[in-house]
């Protein structure tokens, strides 16, 4: 996707060296926006292989209101593992297990998973139970019954619970917009890992828009992505330069078989005609 490559170029050109809460410094710039016409294909990055299975499972995890990594690791999704592991290492139960051993315990021992696999009241909790309000269900009802509303908003940023989250929400608020029988989505993201995170975030909220459009009998419109602190970790610079040498391919298509968003399973979502360049690996900063 040209929009994503242009974003990477912008961070490299405008960004400044900056320290942060992790042990890895960044090249950081502030304030950027991308727009994707979802009718022209599903916006999954093609200039490196991007793990759609992980993206879809994570979104379904959000939709279910789940905040425990057990569902994810049971489905071979490991993008959240590091945070509960770091928390576990500080607990009295820690017995010098490696990350791999910790994850195996999450898979094998439900009691252990319940105690040590939870991330706190992160995305799923806020979407489905923000101080007792099911925001996702409510916004779907509003889209169906009052599509011209300017209040079609879901917020993941709950100041009263931020300190109890292992990682506060990076993608903090999204708004829907209905026009000409098309559903569009606008995401505001406070913090954006340009190399590892943004390809996931684009695809995740595009998928959410497709799911809600089907649920509400609408076509898909645009996905608009606004970013606050956009950064490339310094240990990702070579990977980004490699990716910028590649040319985007045609976007894949998405087939959704189940109309009810609250009953949908991974098997109901099919990605077709996805062509991609080889994977480019990078370490996540915790």
Swiss-Prot record:
Pathway participation: Pyrimidine metabolism; dTTP biosynthesis
A Gene Ontology biological process term: dTMP biosynthetic process
Binding site for dUMP: 21, 150-151, 190-193, 201, 231-233
Residues annotated as signal peptide: none
Domain of life assignment: Bacteria
Keyword DNA repair in annotation: no
UniProt-annotated location(s): Cytoplasm
EC number of this enzyme: 2.1.1.45
An example Gene Ontology CC term for this record: cytosol
Residue positions of the active site: 170 (nucleophile)
GO molecular function terms attached to this record: thymidylate synthase activity
Binding site for (6R)-5,10-methylene-5,6,7,8-tetrahydrofolate: 51, 193, 285
UniProt keyword list: Cytoplasm, Methyltransferase, Nucleotide biosynthesis, Transferase
Catalysis performed (reactions): dUMP + (6R)-5,10-methylene-5,6,7,8-tetrahydrofolate = 7,8-dihydrofolate + dTMP
HAMAP family (alphabetical): Thymidy_synth_bact (MF_00008)
NCBIfam families listed in its UniProt record: PRK01827.1-2, thym_sym
PANTHER family: THYMIDYLATE SYNTHASE, THYMIDYLATE SYNTHASE 1
Assembly description: Homodimer.
Family statement: Belongs to the thymidylate synthase family. Bacterial-type ThyA subfamily.
Function (record text): Catalyzes the reductive methylation of 2'-deoxyuridine-5'-monophosphate (dUMP) to 2'-deoxythymidine-5'-monophosphate (dTMP) while utilizing 5,10-methylenetetrahydrofolate (mTHF) as the methyl donor and reductant in the reaction, yielding dihydrofolate (DHF) as a by-product. This enzymatic reaction provides an intracellular de novo source of dTMP, an essential precursor for DNA biosynthesis.
The protein's name in its UniProt record: Thymidylate synthase
Native organism: Mycoplasmopsis pulmonis (strain UAB CTIP) (Mycoplasma pulmonis)
